[in-house]
Amino acid sequence: MDEEGVHKPAGPPTRKKFLIPTDEDVVPPPGAKPLFRSTRSLPTVETSPPPGPQTYAEYALSGPPGGAEATRPVGPEPLAEETPNQAPKPGAKSNSIIVSPRQRGNPVLRFVRNVPWEFGDVLPDYVLGQSTCALFLSLRYHNLHPDYIHQRLQSLGKSYALRVLLVQVDVKDPQQALKELAKMCILADCTLILAWSPEEAGRYLETYKAYEQKPADLLMEKLEQDFVSRVTECLTTVKSVNKTDSQTLLTTFGSLEQLIAASREDLSLCPGLGPQKARRLFDVFHEPFLKVPH
């Protein structure tokens, strides 16, 4: 018995247990905010590794892990503010180079500065004109995925009259790969162009677009229409006869008729001509235009 008359049990004193209610056990009244956030119902957040390069151009520069057996990357969907334009039909006019979204991130685009370009939903990598398109290929990527360019050329078909395969040479020994690509381009009726840097590849794309509306006269040989120029062009087709010799012959004989009628000795007496040139000229003047079968 203690001083207050409470009976104490015999033996060692026992410890009392206290239960402290937690926020999970007690239902808070409406409108009350808990002091601590409960960790019982937090959702599990799964961490995923950062995505690797998703475009073909980024892959060509960095290369994904997995070697040659890695799956070929597919370009990501464009953002809302970067939605590509609708695909222009072959033959439609455009002032810009239309770039496929799969080329997003390609360093070549940084060097396309002299002509405008924009993303568009197109089948080739670059649409350079009404009837001109280009596919871009890195040799490093081609060595890992040799079937890639076969599928691209097959899907492209004959939609464009001029199909360019723009190859960036970024490997040490490109001879064998270029030999195979050259054979492929012959069979696919495709033009093969080699670039050794992204800057050079960008200049090729710019040039194709800038010269889209230019006539072919810039690439053709300019022929003079006056008589002396035409005779000079004709005489210089004879081996070792140059423009100076042609002018000397015209000055000496006065006309093309008298020049053709001259003997071999008369031709050899012209200054700077000599017997060898005279013999060649004489043989050309007196041989038939068509060989008569014997």
UniProtKB/Swiss-Prot annotation:
Q: Which InterPro entries match?
A: ERCC1-like_central_dom, ERCC1/RAD10/SWI10, Restrct_endonuc-II-like, RuvA_2-like
The annotated regions of Polar residues compositional bias extend over 38-47
Region (HhH2, dimerization with ERRC4/XPF) residue spans: 220-294
**Biological process GO terms, please?**
double-strand break repair; mitotic recombination; negative regulation of telomere maintenance; nucleotide-excision repair; response to oxidative stress; UV-damage excision repair
DNA-binding positions: 130-152
Modified how = Ubiquitinated with both 'Lys-48' and 'Lys-63' linkages. Deubiquitinated by USP45.
Motif window: Nuclear localization signal: 13-19
Q: Does the keyword DNA repair apply?
A: yes
**What does it do?**
Non-catalytic component of a structure-specific DNA repair endonuclease responsible for the 5'-incision during DNA repair. Responsible, in conjunction with SLX4, for the first step in the repair of interstrand cross-links (ICL). Participates in the processing of anaphase bridge-generating DNA structures, which consist in incompletely processed DNA lesions arising during S or G2 phase, and can result in cytokinesis failure. Also required for homology-directed repair (HDR) of DNA double-strand breaks, in conjunction with SLX4.
Q: What is the protein name stated in its UniProt record? A: DNA excision repair protein ERCC-1
> What is the scientific name of the source organism?
Bos taurus
Give the lineage.
Eukaryota, Metazoa, Chordata, Craniata, Vertebrata
**By which gene is this protein encoded?**
ERCC1
